[in-house]
């Protein structure tokens, strides 16, 4: 396959499910919510009792289990917990290597939003953050460039999360067909 430059455009990124009145168990992976509607496995957990990048591992009834323990030392009741749904902004074609050259993440709302960008390595079934909880002011953007390029193997993904529904427009610059 010959090398080719392209842009991957995604409008209005951001899927958020919020539950108030939640309980975060002490130093535990358990969050008790009033209902689990709208929460999905692999959603990011946005709450002061969890470090950035914590994700939903399992849902049983109204208990959500995360892949890492909370940081609180006592049970925390009456918590507002946001569950951030993923938007896949780019998937490298099967059996094709691509390079993420750069990207622009523009805030299209009237308030500041927080942005998380991750790369999912399909062959290793691992996810790593490029940017976690980056504040993007209204009328502004966050740009990935100059800091190095990211190699994507076949079926690897660039995933985007925001703490506000439909808040970010994504423009990724990609070079495909590299060897």
Predicted regions and their residues:
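Intrinsically disordered, low-complexity Pro/Gly/Ser/Thr-rich segments with frequent PxxP/GP/PP motifs
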Residues: 123-157
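Small/polar beta-strand repeat architecture
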Residues: 16-85
């Amino acid at each position: 396959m010959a090398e080719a430059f392209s842009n991957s455009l995604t409008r209005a990124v951001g899927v958020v499910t919020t539950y108030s009145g939640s309980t975060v168990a002490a130093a535990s992976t358990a969050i008790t919510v009033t209902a689990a509607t709208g929460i999905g496995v692999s959603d990011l957990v946005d709450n002061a009792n969890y470090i950035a990048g914590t994700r939903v591992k399992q849902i049983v009834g109204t208990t959500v289990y995360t892949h890492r323990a909370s940081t609180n030392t006592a049970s925390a009741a009456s918590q507002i917990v946001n569950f951030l749904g993923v938007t896949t902004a780019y998937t490298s074609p099967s059996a094709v290597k691509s390079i993420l050259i750069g990207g622009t993440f523009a805030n299209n709302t009237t308030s500041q939003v927080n942005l998380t960008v991750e790369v999912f390595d399909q062959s290793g079934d691992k996810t790593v953050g490029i940017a976690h909880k980056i504040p993007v002011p209204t009328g502004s953007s966050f740009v990935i460039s100059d800091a190095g390029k990211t190699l994507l193997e076949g079926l690897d993904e660039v995933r985007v999360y925001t703490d506000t529904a439909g808040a970010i427009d994504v423009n990724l610059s990609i070079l495909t067909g590299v060897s």
